[in-house]
Amino acid sequence: MNLTIKHISKYKFSKNLSYGVQRLRLKPQNNKIQNINRWNINIQGGVEQFEYLDHHQNLCTFLTLNNDLKEIIISVDGQISTIESNGILGNDKPKTKPWMYKMYTPITKPGNHIKSFCKKWLDLSYSELDICHFVAYDIRKFVKFRKGSTSAYTSAEDSFKKKTGVCQDFTHIFISCLRFLGFSARYVSGYL
């Protein structure tokens, strides 16, 4: 499948910045299930300084922000070819141990609503992969995407109770459910 991605992030500051830095994780890499055909990033208000791989092997871009800056606009335009793999990349050879991704964070800690939602999968005899797919499918049926309905500080439980959220909320709910069910789960990156 060929995917065309156009993405714009705008950051507006309440007062002009005298100095700033920004780390971007907006450069996908080729792997077994995707090939990056074209990928362009345009930065208005900042200058790319260098790239590096973080502890998850994400390609990061380090920016410095222009002096006296009121707004930064980062736009991405790219095309990726993917191979259907049911969402499974395989062994990504993590540098961090899987047990690290079983721990809850304040954002992913499940409350009573998420725990109740997950109970039906606790004793099923399905494969682990099937359970992960069932959870993702049921979250998508239960929670509706609505721009502006949450913030970066909204917990998975709060978004789940509201039955609404944006990409990050779907991810946080999914991670919360999987960790409650005993899986190691972490956010990589991507689009919904």
Model-predicted segments: where are they?
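Linear, non-domain "peripheral" regions
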Residues: M1-K119, F183
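Short alpha-helix boundary/capping motifs
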Residues: S9, K163-Q168
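Short linear sequence elements within intrinsically disordered, low-complexity coil regions
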Residues: N16-S18, T150, I175
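Hydrophobic/aromatic-rich core segments of domains that either
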Residues: V21, Y137, D169-L192
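Secondary-structure boundary elements
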Residues: I80, E84, P98-G165, I173, ...
